[in-house]
Every structure is written in structure tokens, then in C-alpha cells.
Amino acid sequence: MNDKKLTILKAYTQAWNDHDIDTIMSMMADECVFYTIAGPDVMGTEHRGRDKVRAAFEAAWQNFPDAAWLDGEFFDLGGDKAMSTSRFKGTDLQGGKHEAQMVDLFVFDGNKISVKNAFRKNRPAISGD
């Protein structure tokens, strides 16, 4: 993998785990797009532009205050594309525990992420304890 992309994606994932929106947004291109894991459209829900992307990212922590992305692996797909896999783990606002494998597809604009397209297994909440 391109060392720069690898460095960016590792730092990006760490910023997600740190719930550090400012660091995350510093890695996003000015013209950025985020496609959520679910939504009414074929691509999920599209959030276009820094303000909308930021708000959508922050909603992840609002909905899952202890959200974590574990066991990250990173892949260079060639050109301006890359991919990461991780295991999402978090507790929703009703106390439901969630854990599922996920994939993020990225498009880079230079050294910034211009597109984050998220996919996660559709798994019901699991029992706690």
C-alpha cells in the first residue's frame, strides 16, 4: 500500500476511536462526501460538503457513545482508491449492544479523503453481559 495512504487511514481510524472530529475533518477534502451504511437511496444516505459530513460523523457518537472500530486492516485499491475493514462495536442509546464487521471504501483527492462509503453487516443488537 502507498505509505501515505496507509498513514492517513491509520490516523483516521484512530481519530474515529478517539471521537476526535477535528482531526477527522482535517483529513477530509474540501469537497467531501459520506455515504452512510443505511438510508433511503441506493447509496444509503448521502452527506455532501464539510458541514453535512461533519454532522453525520458526529451523529455516530451521539447514537453510539462508546463506538469503537477495532482490528482495522487497510488496503490500497490502486489509483485514488483504498479500503479498510474493521469490527464496529458500540452500545446504542437504548442499551443495545452492537458488534459487526464493516468495510469503508475511500476515494482520495491528493492526501485528503474525498469520499467515505461505509458498509456494515446488518446484525441485530446482541445481549449484553
Enumerate the predicted regions with their spans.
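Generic alpha-helical hydrophobic packing signal
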Residues: I8-A15, R50, R54, K81-M83
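A solvent-exposed, acidic/Ser-Thr-rich amphipathic alpha-helical stretch
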Residues: T23-G78
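Short, low-complexity N-terminal intrinsically disordered segments enriched in polar/charged residues
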Residues: M1-D30
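A beta-strand edge to alpha-helix "cap/lid" segment located at domain peripheries
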Residues: M1-K4, R54-D129
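Preference for short coil/turn "hinge" residues that link or interrupt alpha-helices
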Residues: D18-I21, P40, F106, K112
